[in-house]
A protein has these predicted regions:
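Short, structured coil segments at secondary-structure junctions
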Residues: 3, 89-90, 212
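Active-site HxH/HxHxD metal-binding segment of metal-dependent hydrolases
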Residues: 45-50, 55-143, 234-242
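Short, flexible loop segments at the rims of nucleotide/cofactor-binding pockets, characterized by
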Residues: 14-20, 70-73, 153-156, 192-196
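Metallo-beta-lactamase
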Residues: 44-46, 129, 135, 143-247
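Short Pro/Gly-enriched beta-strand edge/turn motifs at strand-loop
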Residues: 6-16, 122-126, 147-151
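Residue-level marker for buried hydrophobic side chains located in beta-strands
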Residues: 38-40, 71, 94, 175-177, ...
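Conserved beta-strand hairpin/beta-sheet module of binuclear metal-dependent hydrolase folds
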Residues: 2-60, 165-179
């Protein structure tokens, strides 16, 4: 599903998504950098998800041989569970937050609270976290070439400990790939897990409000093509009045 001339949504389940791949996949974005294609987040990777993502890319008239990168925002399974499958299928270079890299490489199910998530019904009980190699460890403030475009890395903890958002300086606009740091309507996700932190969330909202961008591309729910920063400002006004942003779920 084409969003702009350089960004597509090629996956995502029906729960706060477009039904382009299996539940509970997050939005899976594809960036046409002008010199290669990049995927942002991998979904859970179960069922027919990988095949459906592949078919969606082909349906847009894109060449699978141009796929070069997989960018991961954080280590929750609906974003990273399918990373190893995508990496192996398309020989992708994987970029991930430095603080999440070892968890992803080893398939450590502790920090992502996978046992709790499975027992609560978020993921199948028989799901296991397949280790995935990480080629580039991303740190706050990194500015990297992504094909013909520039990508800026922003640490945005709060939803979980090792969470990053990516500011893409595109040809037509600037895009914030926010993962689960912020959603349309200024919403966040509050969860009873060890690293979901109120003060970190507030700090990340205030931090994101210092950046200029047009499009808000979150991990779930509505994608905002223009006026995306306004949704961060909604959350910022809430915390400035000593309140907390509403939860997406």
């Amino acid at each position: 599903m084409r969003i702009t001339n350089e960004v597509y949504v090629v996956g995502g389940g029906t729960n706060f998504g477009f039904g382009l791949s299996d539940d509970p996949d997050c939005h899976i974005y594809l960036i046409d950098t002008g010199d290669g294609l990049a995927i942002v987040d991998a979904g859970l990777g179960e069922g027919e998800s990988i095949s459906r993502i592949t078919a969606n890319i082909l349906a847009e008239g894109l060449d699978l041989s141009d796929l070069k990168w997989l960018l991961l925002t954080h280590y929750h399974m609906d974003h990273v569970g399918g990373a190893a499958k995508l990496r192996d299928r398309f020989n992708l270079e994987v970029w991930a937050p430095a603080d999440a890299a070892e968890v992803i490489r080893t398939g450590d199910e502790g920090p992502p609270s996978l046992t709790i998530a499975k027992s609560s019904g978020l993921y199948p009980m028989d799901f296991t976290f397949e280790p995935c190699g990480v080629d580039v460890e991303l740190r706050d403030g990194d500015r990297l070439r992504l094909g013909n475009l520039e990508l800026e890395v922003i640490d945005t903890p709060g939803h979980c400990h090792a969470h990053q958002s990516f500011l893409l300086h595109g040809r037509s606009r600037r895009y914030l790939f926010a993962g689960d740091a912020i959603f349309s309507g200024g919403r966040v996700v509050w969860q009873n897990i060890w690293d979901n932190n109120v003060q970190d969330t507030v700090a990340s909202i205030n931090k994101l409000a210092t950046f200029d961008f047009d499009a808000l591309c979150p991990g779930h729910a509505a994608v905002v093509v223009d006026g995306g920063k306004r949704h961060v400002e909604i959350a910022q006004r809430k915390v400035e009045s000593l309140g907390l942003p509403a939860s997406l779920v």
